[in-house]
Amino acid sequence: MTTKPQKPHILVCNDDGIEGLGLHALAASMKKLGSVTVVAPAEPQSGKSHGMTLGEPLRIRRYQKNNRFFGYTVSGTPVDCIKVALSHILDAKPDLIVSGINYGSNTAMNSLYSGTVAAAREGAIQNVPSLAFSLTTYENADFTYAAKFARQLAREVLRRGMPPDTILSANIPNVPEKEIRGILFTRQGRSRWEESTIERHDMYGNPYYWLAGSLQLHDNDLAEDEYAVRHNYVAVTPITCDMTDHRFRSELETWGLQNTIKK
Protein backbone atom coordinates (compact mmCIF):
# COMPACT_ATOMS: atom_id res chain seq x y z
CA MET A 1 0.00 0.00 0.00
CA THR A 2 1.43 3.36 -1.05
CA THR A 3 0.92 6.55 0.90
CA LYS A 4 -0.01 9.78 -0.77
CA PRO A 5 2.87 12.29 -0.86
CA GLN A 6 2.36 15.05 1.66
CA LYS A 7 1.50 18.42 0.20
CA PRO A 8 4.09 21.15 0.68
CA HIS A 9 3.44 23.80 3.30
CA ILE A 10 3.85 27.38 2.06
CA LEU A 11 4.15 30.51 4.21
CA VAL A 12 2.81 33.66 2.54
CA CYS A 13 3.79 37.18 3.61
CA ASN A 14 3.96 40.70 2.14
CA ASP A 15 4.74 44.30 3.04
CA ASP A 16 1.49 45.94 1.88
CA GLY A 17 -0.40 44.52 4.86
CA ILE A 18 -3.03 41.86 5.45
CA GLU A 19 -5.60 43.60 3.26
CA GLY A 20 -3.32 43.87 0.23
CA LEU A 21 -4.99 42.44 -2.86
CA GLY A 22 -1.67 41.06 -4.07
CA LEU A 23 -1.34 39.02 -0.88
CA HIS A 24 -4.78 37.51 -1.36
CA ALA A 25 -4.05 36.69 -5.01
CA LEU A 26 -0.75 35.06 -4.06
CA ALA A 27 -2.28 33.01 -1.24
CA ALA A 28 -5.06 31.76 -3.53
CA SER A 29 -2.53 30.75 -6.17
CA MET A 30 -0.30 28.93 -3.66
CA LYS A 31 -3.27 26.91 -2.39
CA LYS A 32 -3.18 25.08 -5.73
CA LEU A 33 0.27 23.77 -4.76
CA GLY A 34 -0.17 22.89 -1.10
CA SER A 35 -1.32 24.04 2.31
CA VAL A 36 -0.92 27.74 3.02
CA THR A 37 -0.40 29.85 6.14
CA VAL A 38 -0.67 33.62 5.76
CA VAL A 39 1.25 35.84 8.20
CA ALA A 40 1.29 39.50 7.21
CA PRO A 41 1.73 42.94 8.76
CA ALA A 42 -1.36 44.41 10.37
CA GLU A 43 -0.63 47.71 8.59
CA PRO A 44 1.24 48.61 5.37
CA GLN A 45 5.02 48.41 5.81
CA SER A 46 6.40 49.52 2.44
CA GLY A 47 10.00 50.68 2.47
CA LYS A 48 10.84 49.04 5.80
CA SER A 49 13.56 46.90 4.20
CA HIS A 50 15.05 44.44 6.73
CA GLY A 51 13.90 46.40 9.76
CA MET A 52 12.59 44.56 12.79
CA THR A 53 10.82 45.70 15.94
CA LEU A 54 12.88 46.09 19.10
CA GLY A 55 11.92 47.71 22.38
CA GLU A 56 8.18 47.20 22.03
CA PRO A 57 5.93 44.14 21.97
CA LEU A 58 4.61 42.41 18.88
CA ARG A 59 0.99 41.34 18.84
CA ILE A 60 -0.44 38.48 16.80
CA ARG A 61 -4.10 38.51 15.76
CA ARG A 62 -6.25 36.10 13.78
CA TYR A 63 -7.68 37.71 10.65
CA GLN A 64 -10.96 36.82 8.97
CA LYS A 65 -12.01 37.37 5.37
CA ASN A 66 -15.71 36.99 4.56
CA ASN A 67 -16.26 35.55 8.05
CA ARG A 68 -13.68 32.81 7.47
CA PHE A 69 -10.20 32.49 8.93
CA PHE A 70 -7.62 33.77 6.42
CA GLY A 71 -4.40 34.16 8.37
CA TYR A 72 -2.54 36.05 11.07
CA THR A 73 -1.53 39.67 11.45
CA VAL A 74 1.59 40.85 13.22
CA SER A 75 1.93 44.39 14.55
CA GLY A 76 5.35 44.83 12.99
CA THR A 77 7.47 44.63 9.86
CA PRO A 78 7.61 41.93 7.18
CA VAL A 79 10.79 40.57 8.78
CA ASP A 80 8.96 40.45 12.14
CA CYS A 81 6.25 38.40 10.43
CA ILE A 82 8.72 35.78 9.22
CA LYS A 83 10.49 35.59 12.57
CA VAL A 84 7.23 35.28 14.53
CA ALA A 85 5.74 32.79 12.07
CA LEU A 86 8.74 30.46 12.33
CA SER A 87 9.13 30.77 16.09
CA HIS A 88 5.54 30.93 17.38
CA ILE A 89 2.86 30.29 14.75
CA LEU A 90 4.06 27.29 12.74
CA ASP A 91 4.81 23.91 14.28
CA ALA A 92 7.58 23.25 11.75
CA LYS A 93 9.49 25.13 9.09
CA PRO A 94 7.53 25.52 5.86
CA ASP A 95 8.75 24.06 2.60
CA LEU A 96 8.64 27.46 0.94
CA ILE A 97 8.16 31.15 1.78
CA VAL A 98 6.62 33.50 -0.79
CA SER A 99 6.36 37.25 -0.31
CA GLY A 100 4.10 39.63 -2.27
CA ILE A 101 2.57 40.32 -4.61
CA ASN A 102 3.86 43.84 -4.10
CA TYR A 103 2.31 46.99 -5.49
CA GLY A 104 5.20 48.46 -7.49
CA SER A 105 8.44 46.99 -8.79
CA ASN A 106 11.35 46.01 -6.59
CA THR A 107 14.06 46.14 -9.19
CA ALA A 108 17.59 47.53 -9.12
CA MET A 109 18.45 49.67 -6.07
CA ASN A 110 14.76 49.73 -5.12
CA SER A 111 15.14 46.17 -3.84
CA LEU A 112 17.32 47.47 -0.98
CA TYR A 113 14.36 49.39 0.46
CA SER A 114 11.80 46.66 -0.07
CA GLY A 115 9.99 44.94 2.78
CA THR A 116 8.72 42.39 0.26
CA VAL A 117 12.25 41.36 -0.69
CA ALA A 118 13.39 41.52 2.95
CA ALA A 119 10.72 39.03 4.03
CA ALA A 120 12.06 36.55 1.49
CA ARG A 121 15.65 37.31 2.51
CA GLU A 122 14.78 36.61 6.15
CA GLY A 123 13.35 33.30 5.01
CA ALA A 124 16.65 32.45 3.32
CA ILE A 125 18.53 33.42 6.49
CA GLN A 126 16.28 30.94 8.31
CA ASN A 127 17.20 28.23 5.75
CA VAL A 128 13.84 28.17 3.97
CA PRO A 129 13.66 28.50 0.16
CA SER A 130 12.11 31.93 -0.41
CA LEU A 131 10.70 33.98 -3.28
CA ALA A 132 9.57 37.60 -3.68
CA PHE A 133 7.04 38.81 -6.25
CA SER A 134 6.33 42.38 -7.33
CA LEU A 135 4.00 43.92 -9.92
CA THR A 136 5.21 47.00 -11.77
CA THR A 137 2.35 49.34 -10.87
CA TYR A 138 0.85 51.23 -7.95
CA GLU A 139 -2.65 51.55 -9.41
CA ASN A 140 -5.02 49.61 -11.68
CA ALA A 141 -3.19 46.46 -10.67
CA ASP A 142 -4.14 43.18 -12.32
CA PHE A 143 -2.56 40.33 -10.35
CA THR A 144 -3.90 37.56 -12.63
CA TYR A 145 -0.75 36.73 -14.54
CA ALA A 146 1.59 37.59 -11.66
CA ALA A 147 -0.20 35.06 -9.44
CA LYS A 148 -0.04 32.44 -12.19
CA PHE A 149 3.68 33.00 -12.74
CA ALA A 150 4.30 32.92 -8.98
CA ARG A 151 2.75 29.47 -8.88
CA GLN A 152 4.89 28.28 -11.82
CA LEU A 153 8.10 29.50 -10.22
CA ALA A 154 7.14 28.17 -6.79
CA ARG A 155 6.43 24.74 -8.28
CA GLU A 156 9.89 24.61 -9.84
CA VAL A 157 11.60 25.71 -6.62
CA LEU A 158 9.71 23.09 -4.61
CA ARG A 159 10.90 20.48 -7.10
CA ARG A 160 14.49 21.64 -7.59
CA GLY A 161 15.39 23.46 -4.37
CA MET A 162 17.47 26.62 -3.92
CA PRO A 163 21.09 27.42 -3.05
CA PRO A 164 21.55 28.48 0.59
CA ASP A 165 21.34 32.19 1.45
CA THR A 166 19.82 33.02 -1.94
CA ILE A 167 16.36 34.22 -2.92
CA LEU A 168 14.63 34.81 -6.24
CA SER A 169 13.02 38.21 -6.72
CA ALA A 170 10.55 38.27 -9.61
CA ASN A 171 9.22 41.49 -11.11
CA ILE A 172 6.21 41.15 -13.39
CA PRO A 173 4.90 43.78 -15.83
CA ASN A 174 1.32 44.92 -15.22
CA VAL A 175 0.08 43.82 -18.64
CA PRO A 176 -2.14 40.97 -19.90
CA GLU A 177 -0.37 37.63 -20.29
CA LYS A 178 -0.52 37.85 -24.09
CA GLU A 179 1.64 40.99 -23.92
CA ILE A 180 4.39 39.33 -21.84
CA ARG A 181 7.40 38.97 -24.15
CA GLY A 182 9.13 36.28 -22.12
CA ILE A 183 10.93 35.44 -18.90
CA LEU A 184 14.50 36.63 -18.34
CA PHE A 185 16.93 35.72 -15.57
CA THR A 186 18.47 39.08 -14.82
CA ARG A 187 20.96 40.82 -12.58
CA GLN A 188 20.15 43.67 -10.22
CA GLY A 189 20.37 46.84 -12.27
CA ARG A 190 21.76 50.26 -11.41
CA SER A 191 18.51 52.23 -11.67
CA ARG A 192 17.83 54.10 -8.48
CA TRP A 193 15.25 56.11 -6.60
CA GLU A 194 15.74 59.84 -7.03
CA GLU A 195 13.98 61.73 -4.26
CA SER A 196 12.27 65.05 -4.00
CA THR A 197 11.42 66.24 -0.49
CA ILE A 198 8.18 68.18 -0.12
CA GLU A 199 8.03 70.65 2.77
CA ARG A 200 4.72 71.55 4.38
CA HIS A 201 3.67 73.26 7.59
CA ASP A 202 1.28 72.24 10.34
CA MET A 203 -1.32 74.54 11.92
CA TYR A 204 1.34 75.94 14.26
CA GLY A 205 3.74 76.81 11.45
CA ASN A 206 6.14 73.95 12.16
CA PRO A 207 7.63 72.36 9.03
CA TYR A 208 7.19 68.68 8.18
CA TYR A 209 8.27 66.71 5.15
CA TRP A 210 7.05 64.10 2.70
CA LEU A 211 9.50 61.97 0.76
CA ALA A 212 8.58 61.64 -2.92
CA GLY A 213 10.38 60.75 -6.12
CA SER A 214 10.57 58.10 -8.81
CA LEU A 215 12.80 55.29 -10.02
CA GLN A 216 15.12 56.67 -12.70
CA LEU A 217 16.40 54.32 -15.38
CA HIS A 218 20.19 53.94 -15.48
CA ASP A 219 20.23 50.65 -17.40
CA ASN A 220 20.16 49.81 -21.11
CA ASP A 221 20.47 46.02 -21.18
CA LEU A 222 17.80 43.32 -21.05
CA ALA A 223 20.10 41.46 -18.65
CA GLU A 224 19.22 44.11 -16.04
CA ASP A 225 15.95 43.79 -14.16
CA GLU A 226 14.41 47.27 -14.49
CA TYR A 227 15.21 47.53 -18.19
CA ALA A 228 13.71 44.08 -18.78
CA VAL A 229 10.37 44.78 -17.07
CA ARG A 230 10.04 48.10 -18.89
CA HIS A 231 10.15 46.06 -22.09
CA ASN A 232 7.41 43.69 -20.86
CA TYR A 233 9.64 40.82 -19.77
CA VAL A 234 9.28 39.06 -16.44
CA ALA A 235 12.59 39.65 -14.65
CA VAL A 236 13.74 36.99 -12.19
CA THR A 237 16.83 38.00 -10.22
CA PRO A 238 18.78 35.74 -7.85
CA ILE A 239 19.83 37.79 -4.81
CA THR A 240 22.27 36.60 -2.16
CA CYS A 241 22.44 37.47 1.52
CA ASP A 242 26.22 37.85 1.21
CA MET A 243 26.72 41.57 0.50
CA THR A 244 30.51 41.36 0.28
CA ASP A 245 32.18 42.95 -2.74
CA HIS A 246 34.62 40.10 -3.31
CA ARG A 247 36.48 41.79 -6.18
CA PHE A 248 37.13 44.94 -4.14
CA ARG A 249 38.10 42.83 -1.14
CA SER A 250 40.91 41.33 -3.24
CA GLU A 251 42.03 44.82 -4.25
CA LEU A 252 42.05 45.93 -0.61
CA GLU A 253 44.70 43.30 0.06
CA THR A 254 47.06 45.32 -2.16
CA TRP A 255 46.66 48.52 -0.13
CA GLY A 256 49.12 47.29 2.49
CA LEU A 257 47.08 48.49 5.46
CA GLN A 258 47.53 45.13 7.16
CA ASN A 259 51.26 45.89 7.41
CA THR A 260 50.76 49.15 9.34
CA ILE A 261 49.92 47.44 12.64
CA LYS A 262 52.96 47.30 14.89
CA LYS A 263 53.18 44.18 17.00
Swiss-Prot record:
Residues involved in a divalent metal cation binding: 15-16, 46, 102
Entry EC number(s): 3.1.3.5
Cofactor stoichiometry and binding remark: Binds 1 divalent metal cation per subunit.
Keyword Aminoacyl-tRNA synthetase in annotation: no
Reaction catalysis annotation: a ribonucleoside 5'-phosphate + H2O = a ribonucleoside + phosphate
A GO cellular component annotation in the UniProt record: cytoplasm
GO molecular function per UniProt: 3'-nucleotidase activity; 5'-nucleotidase activity; exopolyphosphatase activity; metal ion binding; nucleotide binding
Sorted UniProt keywords: Cytoplasm, Hydrolase, Metal-binding, Nucleotide-binding
Enzyme type, top EC level: hydrolase
Cofactor(s) listed: a divalent metal cation
Location(s), subcellular: Cytoplasm
Family the entry assigns: Belongs to the SurE nucleotidase family.
Function text: Nucleotidase that shows phosphatase activity on nucleoside 5'-monophosphates.
Protein known as: 5'-nucleotidase SurE
Biological source species: Chlorobaculum tepidum (strain ATCC 49652 / DSM 12025 / NBRC 103806 / TLS)
Gene that this sequence comes from: surE
